[in-house]
Amino acid sequence: KAGFTRSGPDMWHINCRPDHLIASAKKSLQKLGLERIPLWQLHRIDSRVPRAEQFGAVKQLLDEGLIAHAGLSEVSVADIKAASAVFPVATVQNSYNLADRHSDDVVDYCAASGIGFIPYYPLGGDGELTRAGGALDKLAKAKGVTQGQVALAWLLKRSPTMLPIPGTSKVAHLEENVAAAGLALTDEEFAALDRKRR
């Protein structure tokens, strides 16, 4: 990812000036020891920099072979369309989970356009949905799995281009998350969870 500068602990600022984006990509290549970054995300669109300049910098990185694929983060459908007019958008990363559905239209657009959708905070949820005895809890217990596994299975059923990458710090959690890919929700189970949030 690129598009931020850091001025201190927990002090991040959007910076999508073309020179900064290109320098950030080159620095990442050096740190990673790569000749090309497989997937590079524009972390935010900078309201202070003309979009044509930001998107042009991404295209330059692609044209020069420094990145293989480019994505966007925290964008609308209109943003994706504008960027797609300049470079091929491979992925979009927005906040999205069972409880946070503000990007439903973006998920649908990405699916229709063959763009990968990476949900930020995929295991997020609110008290009503995740409380003991709630819909998610009941379904997880009925299937003998965790609430997190059901939440991931719901995301995977939600869209064919959904690419959840839940953060984890323990091998047991990693194995649990991977196992969610084999958990199939019925249409009725999916719809029941879907209705709880709409």
Each PLM stretch: what is its role?
Residues 29-50:
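Active-site groove signature of glycoside hydrolases
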Residues 2-4, 36, 168:
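Short, small-residue-rich loop/turn micro-motifs
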Residues 45-198:
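Beta/alpha (TIM)-barrel catalytic core signal, keyed to glycine-rich beta->alpha loops juxtaposed to Asp/Glu
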Residues 2, 6-22:
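Active-site mouth loops of central-metabolism enzymes
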Residues 2-4, 41-44, 121:
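Short, histidine-centered active-site or binding-site loop motifs used for metal coordination
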Residues 16-32, 76-82:
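Short, acidic/polar
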